[in-house]
């Protein structure tokens, strides 16, 4: 891998006009400049595409609903050596891409890196416990089940290896395809957790039931998936009802 590899950032979008501009502006403020920004529209009926035109290097369209399908389209068309997904409600620290490149340059054996997610709306104390809980959950999951607690919004992958393992399984209805992809990648090298590689994301998926209660529920489901990785279906996963309301029948 080159010392300054091209990174492809893929942003799946479905009716995100209220938040998309802020996210794309944030990406454009990265200190690392060798990247391409790809927005994949997943059937928006609002102004999302027009907003994307102001910032994206490339806009693609995927008719089949679901973020996995949109991500897959983006990654398939990506030119970068490293591919990264960014949710439309996520924000990167300014040095986020720099940290990713530093991690990959430390060892050729590293095929993917990932880190924790913390909430934009929460305070430092709340996010400290979120970060702590995420780190502990990931450690225990790897020790007992050899499963990585990976979230697509903070997951960087060598494209060559992603292509080699066949990427995401877009035909599966099993929950958390990111966990399964990480397992496939780990057969070809090291999948590394970096606690300091933080992405800020919105707690909007959790607001209905309260953030704390929803976090406990999501941690429980993560463990359920880790211990029963081929049994938990998406219909029972914690984001299902949220995405149903957005009109995505099989968002994963």
Task: State where each predicted segment sits.
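Conserved donor NDP-sugar-binding/catalytic core segment of glycosyltransferases
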Residues: 95-125
